[in-house]
Amino acid sequence: MNKLKITQIKSSIGCLKKHKSTLYGLGLRHIGHTVIRQNSPRLLGMINSISYLVKIKD
């Protein structure tokens, strides 16, 4: 499986509580924070729901 590099590019202030929970579930805490995760269908679903807050690199 590939790894994805996920970076938070927008603030979570004013977002839905569900989207904030998704950010924390991915391990993102603040703007500019980057995490590396294994690519999986579950992860892609999480990213899809908060696509306006994050940037993805393969």
Curated annotation (Swiss-Prot):
Keyword match Ribosomal protein: yes
One GO location term (cellular component): cytosolic large ribosomal subunit
Protein's name according to its UniProt entry: Large ribosomal subunit protein uL30
Lineage: Bacteria, Pseudomonadati, Pseudomonadota, Gammaproteobacteria, Enterobacterales
Example GO biological process: translation
Gene3D superfamilies hit by this protein: Ribosomal protein L30, ferredoxin-like fold domain (3.30.1390.20)
UniProt keyword annotation of RNA-binding present: no
Family, similarity comment: Belongs to the universal ribosomal protein uL30 family.
Molecular function GO terms recorded: structural constituent of ribosome
Assembly: Part of the 50S ribosomal subunit.
One Pfam family per UniProt: Ribosomal_L30
Source organism, top-level taxon: Bacteria
Keywords, in A-Z order: Ribonucleoprotein, Ribosomal protein
